[in-house]
């Protein structure tokens, strides 16, 4: 099946499965093409491509799998190609005529519209206007169809009007994200939940429904790459979906510091204060970077009090507990803990696999269970590294024209990471790490004590040694003070059972795996 045959049918399928507004805004205006044998969907700009990949790529690829399974997955990129008409009835393909955006060899085809639209530059919104304001203003300037006489048959909206409405909606959407600094990719729909983030995700959804009420401030902490930014931006995107007129802003603490310093230099302090006080939801990532900056901390203290008194929502992220931020104003440390403070944990195996499967679905690529398990076992530390590994494998899949990611493809794409991970890990390294983690002596791990606080870490160390080294059971026994191999086997089985029954031990085990391998 050619692209000219496929795309009209795909449009029909998408038209039938999507809400009318979504189809008109995002799918109907698309153009397509073929580059080097690869089918390409062109978006108006990078923002549109990001939205397509995060929200619609899975549906487009599902249709391709059904109607043109032999073709490789679509690539999404900014540009213009050929626009095809939607098939009137499924199975009846319209003639493959290039439409408004088709480009012939050497000369562009001129757009022919039923109604002439005045050409004008896109309206750039004032900083104080909301997306709803922008949309309302621009909708007033759209060309309107003549009013139909009573009882007469209504005729379809003209191409010009439909296109203009779609462009206005999309431009307003882009303006919203420019104002808020939120990524359209970070939503609750694209968030994968697991043990490490389930409670935080539930709290975030509650905040999006009722900001400024129960959990204010919402303080989220954890190591880098665990998904803090995704989760807090999802709150902003969800709030705007429910309340388009809400004033939301996401920023890194460095941006807050720079804007404050600029206000001091330019003597625009009052403007600075009013700018931040206007927001209904303010999200600041990595708040720890304001530590040691006395004037910035003082100003943020007053801003915090304003948000709290006005019941406006404040969301903050950090790499450690508020109480452990060295150099932070004690008053701020205290206020950070007034609301809800939660930690994000490294993703467990099941969550890592689910993340890979979700990424594959969004990219329109199939991934075999064995390959997902392999990648999830290889990358244990954080979500960011896991997504980076998937992007490499996904790129290899497209370049090699292999629509299914299997374990061989994953191994080939990640061979340098595999080589790094396979550095020599010895029983001594594991014993030392476990002793430090549980705050016991190495001599206790190797000794004869059988108290629970010693025996359990010893069994964990044995199990880790079995997983991370090539030592046999007798050799592991020798490394642990000359123990019998049956003792080692018993310890490994005990830990395997406890990892299923005891969430705390399972979490300890995962943390130790990450510490030892990194």
From Swiss-Prot:
Pfam families listed in its UniProt record: Bac_DnaA, Bac_DnaA_C, DnaA_N
Start and end residues of each stretch annotated as Domain IV, binds dsDNA: 398-518
Q: Which UniProt keywords apply?
A: ATP-binding, Cytoplasm, DNA replication, DNA-binding, Lipid-binding, Nucleotide-binding
Q: Does the keyword Nucleotide-binding apply?
A: yes
What Gene Ontology cellular component terms go with this record? cytoplasm; plasma membrane
Its annotated compartments are: Cytoplasm
- InterPro entries the UniProt entry points to: AAA+_ATPase, Chromosome_initiator_DnaA, Chromosome_initiator_DnaA-like, Chromosome_initiator_DnaA_CS, DnaA_C, DnaA_dom, DnaA_N_dom, DnaA_N_sf
The reply to whether ATP-binding figures as a keyword in the UniProt entry is yes
**Region of interest (Disordered), ranges:** 145-172
Can you name this protein? Chromosomal replication initiator protein DnaA
The record comments on the domains as follows:
Domain I is involved in oligomerization and binding regulators, domain II is flexibile and of varying length in different bacteria, domain III forms the AAA+ region, while domain IV binds dsDNA.
Assembly information from the UniProt record:
Oligomerizes as a right-handed, spiral filament on DNA at oriC.
Q: Where is this region: Domain I, interacts with DnaA modulators?
A: 1-72
Q: Which GO terms describe its molecular function?
A: ATP binding; ATP hydrolysis activity; DNA replication origin binding; lipid binding
Q: Where is this region: Domain III, AAA+ region?
A: 181-397
Q: Which residues bind ATP?
A: 225, 227-229
Function, as annotated: Plays an essential role in the initiation and regulation of chromosomal replication. ATP-DnaA binds to the origin of replication (oriC) to initiate formation of the DNA replication initiation complex once per cell cycle. Binds the DnaA box (a 9 base pair repeat at the origin) and separates the double-stranded (ds)DNA. Forms a right-handed helical filament on oriC DNA; dsDNA binds to the exterior of the filament while single-stranded (ss)DNA is stabiized in the filament's interior.
Lineage summary: Bacteria, Pseudomonadati, Pseudomonadota, Betaproteobacteria, Neisseriales
**Chain segments carrying region Domain II:** 72-180
GO BP annotations of the record are: DNA replication; DNA replication initiation; regulation of DNA replication
PROSITE patterns on file = DNAA (PS01008)
């Amino acid at each position: 099946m050619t692209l000219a045959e496929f795309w009209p049918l795909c449009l029909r399928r998408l038209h039938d499965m999507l809400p009318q507004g979504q189809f008109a805004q995002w799918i109907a205006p698309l153009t397509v093409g073929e580059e080097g044998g690869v089918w390409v969907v062109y978006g108006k700009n990078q923002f549109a491509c990001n939205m397509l990949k995060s929200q619609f790529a899975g549906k487009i690829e599902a249709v391709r799998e059904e109607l043109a399974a032999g073709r490789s997955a679509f690539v999404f990129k900014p540009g213009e190609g050929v626009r095809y008409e939607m098939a009137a009835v499924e199975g009846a393909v319209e003639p493959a005529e290039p439409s408004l955006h088709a480009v012939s060899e050497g000369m562009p085809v001129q757009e022919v519209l039923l109604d002439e639209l005045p050409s004008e530059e896109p309206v750039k919104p004032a900083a104080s206007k909301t997306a709803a304001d922008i949309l309302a203003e621009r909708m007033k300037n759209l060309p309107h169809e003549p009013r139909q006489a009573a009882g007469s048959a209504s005729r379809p909206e003209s191409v010009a009007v439909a296109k203009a409405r779609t462009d206005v909606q999309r431009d307003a959407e882009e303006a919203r994200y420019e104002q808020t600094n939120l990524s359209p990719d970070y939503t609750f729909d694209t968030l994968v939940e697991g043990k490490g983030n389930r409670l935080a995700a539930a709290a975030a959804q509650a905040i999006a429904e009722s900001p400024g009420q129960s959990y204010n401030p919402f303080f989220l902490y954890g190591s880098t790459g665990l998904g803090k930014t995704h989760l807090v931006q999802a709150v902003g995107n969800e709030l705007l979906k429910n309340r388009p007129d809400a004033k939301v802003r996401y920023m890194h603490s460095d941006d807050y510091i720079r804007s404050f310093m600029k206000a001091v230099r330019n003597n625009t302090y009052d403007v600075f204060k009013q700018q931040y006080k206007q927001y209904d939801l303010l999200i600041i990532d990595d708040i720890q970077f304001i530590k040691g900056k006395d004037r910035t901390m003082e100003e943020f203290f007053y801003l915090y009090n304003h948000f709290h008194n006005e019941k406006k929502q404040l969301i903050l992220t950090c790499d450690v507990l508020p109480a452990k931020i060295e150099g932070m104003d004690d008053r701020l440390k205290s206020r950070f803990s007034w609301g809800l403070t939660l930690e994000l944990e490294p993703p467990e195996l099941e969550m890592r696999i689910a993340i890979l499967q979700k990424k594959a679905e969004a990219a329109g690529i199939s991934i075999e269970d064995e390959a997902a398990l392999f990648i999830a076992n290889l990358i244990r530390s954080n979500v960011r590294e896991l997504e980076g590994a998937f992007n490499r494998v996904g790129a290899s899949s497209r370049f090699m024209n292999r629509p299914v990611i299997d374990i061989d493809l994953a191994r080939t794409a990640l061979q340098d990471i595999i080589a790094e991970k396979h550095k020599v890990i010895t029983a001594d390294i594991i014993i030392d790490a476990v002793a430090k983690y549980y705050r016991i002596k190495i001599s206790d791990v190797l000794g004869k004590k059988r108290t629970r606080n010693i025996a359990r870490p010893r069994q964990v160390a044995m199990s880790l040694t079995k997983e991370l080294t090539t030592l046999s059971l007798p050799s592991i026994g020798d490394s642990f003070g000359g123990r019998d191999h049956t003792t080692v086997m018993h310890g490994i089985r005990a830990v395997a059972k406890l990892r299923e029954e005891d969430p705390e031990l399972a979490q300890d085990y995962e943390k130790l795996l990450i510490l030892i391998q990194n």
